[in-house]
Amino acid sequence: MCSSDLPYRYTEGGSISTPFYCHLCDIMAKFAELLGLQDDVDHFLFCKRFATNAYNAMFFDVATANYENGSVTANLLPLAFGMIPEEWEGDVFANILNMTENRFGGHVSTGVVGIQQLMRTLTDRGRADLALKFATDDTYPSWGYMVRNGATTIWELWNGNTADPSMNSGNHVMLLGDLILWEYEYLGGIRALEPGYSKILIKPTFIDGLDTVRCAYESVSGRIESNWRRDGDMMIGEILIPANTTAEVWLPGDDEVRKFGSGRHTLFTRVR
């Protein structure tokens, strides 16, 4: 989100609303499955398929592998929400990277809507390095740029200190996007496998240039920790698993899942 008259920075409303409708259909189908309502599961999945087919017919350009005007948000949302035919996913993601790294110089290239899915989608598709650059950058546009220019909360606009007309809000937390989720779920790798964190997944992402991660989460089951440091070609981890819970640990480079009970555990893995 910025104050700009550049058309490639904007995404048409229709190409935003439908992906979120499809995302909500997925969520409702999961709710229905938990309740044992198979007819409702089938209904919501049908609604998603119907909307997805119409959306792709309306907005997807086969010649360029772009949605709508090719903005990062226009391509990112259908990719994040599983709406793109599998054979086109790689080309659409390549367009996201091309726009981000070339036109935007490796900077954040979405507004308040797209930023909700940006960090996780990049990491899921093998570009955690780019997500880390976004998280640590302090040049415009970035979260670090806000901090460097005196912000103590998240601005409404990436260019909030220079926008004309000026921004309305200097406390616009939604522009933080999925940054904090990404830090906990991807850098620390802490996720719930079962409700209430009675069963925990620890699946950290190791990124070149990031040598130390310390992550703790106060879950309803107790404190969970996932701490990692690099030592040469080894990653050394210390995890804390709450009482009466279990954890599965998936580490890059490991061929199998490690399973742990309650307590503090030290782990070693070689970084390939």
Predicted regions and their residues:
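Well-ordered alpha-helical scaffold segments within catalytic/enzyme domains
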Residues: 20-38, 76-86, 116-126, 182-189, ...
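Solvent-exposed loop and edge beta-strand segments that line ligand/cofactor-binding
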Residues: 5-20, 57-75, 81, 99-115, ...
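Mature, folded catalytic cores of secreted/periplasmic enzymes
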Residues: 23, 43, 50, 54, ...
